[in-house]
């Protein structure tokens, strides 16, 4: 991480939320800000910080900003990182380097690596007189023969059920439903996430072991000259390191390709690699999700040690899934609704396995699972006033949070509560992909939801996608808007999220008799409290 690497350059770095820095940004050390936007608004733990900056305090700090975003969200792309950068500069701050910009639809990690290197290079130039720079190798590995357990201490849930909803077929992946008992003391709200720490698929781990001529029970001892996410100074199996500590399938960055080209001893392969780090990178690497391992297998003349390989890999990341249940159903158990990604690799090497989805798919009843609750954005929950109408738009497993919303409304009806209308616009490829059809029918009969469905492989009356249904119902949507309804979307950022936004702009244009720009502004204002999107890349 950035903080751990800072120690290599003589800095003792600390990490905290932006809100925690309100009123006391340090002036005696560099301030590095990494942040994103949520529908053009600050993240939950940055709202107070942004409001603080807008009071124009005196901030004579040295700072740098790196923003995270997704280029498909054109109107709000890096809006908050840019705003923070400009506000600090206008209140006395001095930029260490220009703002960095990571694109989740592009070479995000490559962009971050380049920005990080520029940051540390600039800091070194300014502070070489009083910084003790560590230049020794950061990671060394010794092959040993003794054994020791991992001993990781984390919160564990227990798998109560794991069933297939839809088998994998030629047009889509397997879909599964899991029920998980939460770790002791954890609670959740409808619309929250379950954060899961997975392990890598055995098939991919085996490929790495084969590439480096290691057996699964080979034990290593890792020593590091700086902070590291690896377990250090005691023996651990190579299998455990590869399965539980590093990302094996993340696309290789341009910089990493250049590193491999430098250790490639076949001239033809070296030329090809340098080309891949150039103009063809996005098409041949990013779009095909080619990993470091894929490159090592495709270009065998690359000479890389196991330690060098591990140094190229980021820490295994926690994945989060929308919870598809309500605590009114069971406050100690959550359900997940997932796609299981297992397809031929676009790189041409083996299969591409979704790390977390395959981990979850292979769990058995009574298995323990490393997990915890993570709160969703404050706006992505059912209204506290149950009488407020809600309109939900989803495709595929994007129905997950809305199953929880509807389950909650059904439970409230049983308790005699007055509830507003709930309308679900749901898109699937075929009728066989229609998830929770029986439950939705039951909930519709008791008045908890009205379901509008559409099937992209069975176009009817010109309607193919969710946005087609929404546009057809635009007069009803307008009435629901006038009645104070809240609108929610969950699904693919590139497909559903962007399309629904475009559709709503058109509806507002017609409803308010205004132009596209004015309609877009109205929708932006709605995003503050009435129009919420939870999308995945």
Question: Where are the model-predicted features located?
Answer:
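FNR-like FAD-binding dehydrogenase module
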Residues: 1-537
């Amino acid at each position: 991480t950035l903080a751990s690497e800072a120690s290599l350059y003589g800095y003792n770095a600390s990490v905290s939320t932006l809100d925690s820095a309100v009123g006391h940004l340090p002036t005696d050390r560099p301030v590095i800000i990494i942040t994103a936007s949520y529908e053009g608004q600050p993240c939950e733990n940055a709202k107070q910080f942004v409001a603080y900056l807008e009071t124009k305090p005196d901030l004579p700090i040295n700072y740098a900003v790196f923003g995270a975003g997704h280029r498909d969200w054109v109107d709000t792309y890096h809006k908050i990182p840019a705003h923070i950068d400009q506000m600090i500069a206008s209140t006395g701050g001095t930029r260490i380097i220009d703002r960095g910009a990571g694109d989740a639809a592009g070479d995000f990690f490559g962009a971050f690596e380049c920005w990080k290197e520029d940051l540390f290079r600039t800091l070194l130039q300014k502070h070489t007189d009083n910084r003790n720079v560590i230049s020794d190798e950061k990671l060394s590995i010794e092959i040993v023969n003794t054994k020791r357990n991992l001993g990781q201490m984390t919160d564990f849930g227990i798998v109560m059920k794991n069933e297939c909803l839809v088998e994998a077929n030629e047009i889509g992946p397997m879909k599964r439903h899991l029920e998980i008992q939460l770790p002791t003391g954890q609670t959740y709200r409808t619309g929250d996430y379950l954060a899961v720490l997975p392990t890598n698929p055995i098939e991919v781990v085996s490929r790495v072991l084969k590439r480096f001529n290691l057996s699964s029970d080979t034990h290593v001892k890792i020593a590091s000259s700086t902070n590291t996410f690896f377990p250090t100074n005691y023996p651990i199996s190579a299998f455990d390191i590869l399965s539980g500590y590093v990302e094996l399938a993340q696309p290789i960055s341009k910089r990493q390709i250049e590193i491999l080209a430098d250790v490639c001893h076949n001239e033809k392969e070296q030329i090809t690699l340098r080309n891949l780090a150039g103009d063809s990178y996005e098409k041949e690497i990013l779009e095909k999700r080619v990993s470091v391992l894929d490159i090592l297998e495709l270009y065998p003349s690359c000479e890389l040690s196991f330690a060098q390989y591990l140094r190229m890999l980021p820490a295994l990341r926690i994945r989060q899934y929308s919870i598809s249940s309500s605590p009114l159903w069971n406050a100690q158990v959550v359900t997940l609704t997932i796609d299981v990604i297992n397809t031929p690799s676009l790189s041409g090497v083996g299969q591409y396995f979704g790390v977390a989805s395959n981990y979850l798919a292979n769990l058995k009843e009574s298995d323990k699972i490393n997990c915890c609750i993570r709160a969703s954005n404050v706006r992505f929950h059912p209204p506290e006033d149950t009488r407020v109408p809600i309109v939900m738009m989803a495709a595929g497993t994007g129905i997950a949070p809305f199953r929880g919303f509807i389950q909650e409304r059904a439970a409230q009806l049983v308790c005699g509560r007055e509830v507003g209308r709930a309308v679900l616009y749901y898109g699937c490829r075929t009728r066989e992909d229609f998830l929770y059809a029986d439950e939705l029918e039951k909930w519709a009969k008791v008045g908890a939801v009205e379901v509008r469905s559409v099937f992209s492989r069975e176009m009817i009356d010109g309607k193919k996608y969710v946005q087609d249904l929404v546009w057809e119902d635009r007069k009803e949507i307008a009435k629901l808007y006038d009645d104070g309804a809240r609108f929610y979307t969950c699904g693919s950022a590139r497909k559903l999220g962007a399309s629904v936004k475009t559709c709503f702009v058109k509806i507002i244009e017609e409803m308010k008799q205004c132009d596209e720009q004015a309609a877009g502004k109205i929708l932006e204002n709605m995003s503050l409290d009435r129009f919420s999107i939870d999308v995945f890349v």
